[in-house]
Design a protein with these regions (language model features):
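Core catalytic lobe of class I
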Residues: 1-111
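S-adenosyl-L-methionine
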Residues: 115-131
Length: 131
């Protein structure tokens, strides 16, 4: 399953009416054209703000988790995170209308993550985004 998260730019239409000669294939006619309504497939580098002063030393941005969840799952799907840390994946799952199951081994981190997830649940229930 792949739901690309398109970016948008200027629409365009290009035509390449070139002909030429190739040592491998001989004479050729190239009359291909390209057009775009402005949608662009995602590139291979994502730019998202980093988390500073987070709950967990390796905390990821919610926006990054939302991107991957929207790209590789359907709404209503279950998202699993076996190393939940601060609960970012759970927050992102709620923000994108997915269910989640998370595991965290460290009791001190688990307690903080559970509080964060509950705050996010209340925000999402109230029509806002969890953070």
């Amino acid at each position: 399953m792949y739901h690309p998260q398109f970016t948008y730019g200027e629409p365009y239409r290009k035509t390449n009416p070139r002909s030429g000669c190739s040592t491998n294939y001989g004479k050729f006619e190239r009359t291909g054209s390209e057009s775009s309504d402005g949608r662009r497939y995602p590139g291979n580098v994502l730019f998202v703000p980093t988390v500073t002063g987070g709950i967990h030393p390796t905390q990821k941005p919610v926006e990054l988790c939302e991107y991957f969840i929207k790209t590789y799952t359907n709404e209503g799907a279950v998202v699993a995170d076996i190393c939940a840390g601060s609960g970012t994946t759970a927050v992102a799952a709620m923000n994108t209308s997915r269910r989640f199951i998370c595991f965290e081994n460290a009791p001190s981190i688990y307690t903080i993550a559970a509080q964060r997830i509950e705050q996010a649940r209340l925000a999402v229930t109230g029509g806002e985004k969890g953070e």
